[in-house]
Amino acid sequence: KVYGRCELAAAMKRLGLDNYRGYSLGNWVCAAKFESNFNTHATNRNTDGSTDYGILQINSRWWCNDGRTPGSRNLCNIPCSALLSSDITASVNCAKKIVSDRNGMNAWVAWRNRCKGTDVHAWIRGCRL
């Protein structure tokens, strides 16, 4: 599923991401835009053999199990396929675990490069939340 900007903001808010670990909702919407273009089915293979999955491009080396990543830790205890669902609950729950790490949202390269230090509130402007 490809979410609309405000549709995704509303879903993320409902699932408790707004101000989770101090990151406002706009940060999450911005991250999703530049990680997956709001597409829950996005997958991208990395040079180390791991794959990033779903709307927040969660990595199989650490966070989920896809059965083909050597030394996978599966710290979210989920199959990576769960991160491709049109229902973003699994992605959000895993993202909460990721952002609770000391690096916070810096774990997301796209957030670090495209969202960090910008006016992320613009991503939810005009949305009825």
Curated annotation (Swiss-Prot):
Catalysed reactions, as listed in the record: Hydrolysis of (1->4)-beta-linkages between N-acetylmuramic acid and N-acetyl-D-glucosamine residues in a peptidoglycan and between N-acetyl-D-glucosamine residues in chitodextrins
Catalytic residues (positions): E35, D52
Broad class of enzyme this protein falls into: hydrolase
Disulfide bonds: C6-C127, C30-C115, C64-C80, C76-C94
InterPro entries found in the cross-reference section: Glyco_hydro_22, Glyco_hydro_22_CS, Glyco_hydro_22_lys, Lysozyme-like_dom_sf
Keywords of this entry: Antimicrobial, Bacteriolytic enzyme, Disulfide bond, Glycosidase, Hydrolase, Secreted
Family affiliation: Belongs to the glycosyl hydrolase 22 family.
Name listed for the protein in its UniProt record: Lysozyme C
Gene from which the chain derives: LYZ
